[in-house]
A protein has these predicted regions:
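Sec/Tat signal peptide C-region and signal peptidase I cleavage site
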Residues: 14-20
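Acidic helix-start/capping segments at beta-turn-to-alpha-helix junctions
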Residues: 61-78
């Protein structure tokens, strides 16, 4: 009986998150004195790829948050998608294009600036914006 309940719970989670608008928040602890360079590299190599995915309707929105005062998670990227499956498809496409178009030494440099990283996937319960 426990196995059936567990399977039911997993199915409920899948059904809920696979059909609801989501926001993925990718938080980074970036070396403080490297933040400006990190943003410059991302603006050149990462952002145009994911902005294009929004323009093509594959993602709903992308953005970057940054602060120099507060907690240690000083740079975050966020991605809104109509559902988890759409996000995963767009993410895979975007990351593949990034890897193909960005020299390995630049990717290594970006990675070396990140001391720690974590991702969270949120189901949007309320969102209002003027478009």
């Amino acid at each position: 009986m426990r196995a059936i309940k567990r399977i039911g719970f997993i199915f409920l989670l899948f059904a809920t998150y696979s059909h609801a608008q989501i926001m993925v928040v990718s938080q980074n602890k970036v070396v403080f004195h490297k933040m400006k360079e990190y943003h410059e590299l991302m603006e050149k190599h990462w952002n145009p790829i994911f902005d294009k995915l929004v323009d093509e309707g594959k993602l709903d929105e992308v953005g970057t948050l940054s602060h120099a005062w507060g907690d240690e998670w000083n740079i975050a990227g966020y991605y809104k998608a109509k559902d988890l499956a759409s996000f995963e498809k767009a993410w895979n496409e975007g990351y593949e294009k990034f890897a193909e178009s960005t020299p390995q030494n630049v990717r290594n440099k970006i990675t070396s600036m990140i001391m720690e990283h974590k991702d969270s996937i949120y189901q949007l319960k309320h969102s209002h914006s003027r478009k």
